[in-house]
UniProtKB/Swiss-Prot annotation:
It comes from Thiobacillus thioparus. GO terms for biological process: thiocyanate catabolic process. Coiled coil: none annotated. GO terms for molecular function: thiocyanate hydrolase activity. This is Thiocyanate hydrolase subunit beta. The keyword rRNA-binding does not apply. It catalyses: thiocyanate + H2O + 2 H(+) = carbonyl sulfide + NH4(+). Pathway: Organosulfur degradation; thiocyanate degradation. Heterododecamer consisting of 4 alpha, 4 beta, and 4 gamma subunits. Pfam families: NHase_beta_N (PF21006).
Amino acid sequence: MSSSIREEVHRHLGTVALMQPALHQQTHAPAPTEITHTLFRAYTRVPHDVGGEADVPIEYHEKEEEIWELNTFATCECLAWRGVWTAEERRRKQNCDVGQTVYLGMPYYGRWLLTAARILVDKQFVTLTELHNKIVEMRERVASGQGLGEYLPPKAK
C-alpha cells in the first residue's frame, strides 16, 4: 500500500472515529442469568436519562447564543423541513446513540452537528470522503488566517 493511500485511509479512519460513540469492549454477551441489577441498569439507561442520579446542583448561567449555534439550529431545521430526518430520528441519534462519553463531553449544538453529519452520511446525501474533504478544507482556511466569513473573521495582520 503506497504512503499516500495509507495516509488517506488514516484520515478516513480518524473522521470515522470522531463520528462514532466511544466503544466499550465486552468479550461476550452475558446470559440472562448473569445480568445483575447494576448491569441491567447500565444496558437500559440512556445518557440523557439522569433522573435519580446522585449529583450536585449546577449553577445556571445565562449565555448569549453564538453564531455557529444559531446556524446549526437553522441548518438542522432545514434538514427536517426538506425531509432528510424526523424529529424522532434526530433525538434518537443525538441523545441515545452517541454514547455517554460523547453526550456528556460535547456542547449541546455540537451534538446536533454530529447528528446531522451522521444522518447525511448514513442516508447517502454525502459520502464520508466528501465530508472529510470539507472538514480538511475548513481547517486549512482557518489555519491560513482566511477565516470562515461571518462565522470566524480573518486574523488581523
